[in-house]
């Protein structure tokens, strides 16, 4: 299973459609990455999601522990990148829906 559309929307709003690592505006060229892989017990939740550009997503996934070259992104580091970027976006006047109740109260104009 993958992230729900609601979680994808929340992460895109929270990051301003900018990558949480390189901070580049990416528009549609974004992916939501599992901080802890599902294969390792990670979940499809907002807390386990980090929005990344295609390049940073490839970089995060590329590390090979059998041939360690460079320093692997850790879960803790990814969480800090995400949280710091969400705070930076929020300080510019954007307000993310941080709880499910807040998110569900948002009205969609049609």
Q: Over which residues does each language-model region extend?
A:
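Charge-rich interaction segments
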Residues: 83-110
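Accessory nucleic-acid engagement/destabilization modules that flank
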Residues: 66, 73, 78, 85-88, ...
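Histidine-centered nuclease catalytic patch
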Residues: 3-12, 18-51, 60-74
């Amino acid at each position: 299973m993958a992230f729900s559309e609601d979680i994808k929307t929340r992460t895109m709003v929270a990051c301003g459609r900018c990558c949480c690592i390189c901070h580049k505006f990416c528009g549609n060229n974004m992916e939501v990455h599992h901080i802890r892989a599902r294969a390792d017990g990670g979940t499809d939740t907002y807390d386990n999601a980090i929005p990344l550009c295609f390049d940073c997503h490839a970089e995060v996934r590329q590390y090979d522990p059998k041939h360690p070259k460079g320093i692997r992104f850790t879960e803790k580091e990814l969480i800090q990148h995400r949280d710091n970027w969400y705070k930076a976006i929020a300080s510019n006047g954007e307000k993310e829906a941080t709880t499910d109740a807040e998110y569900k109260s948002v009205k969609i104009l049609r």
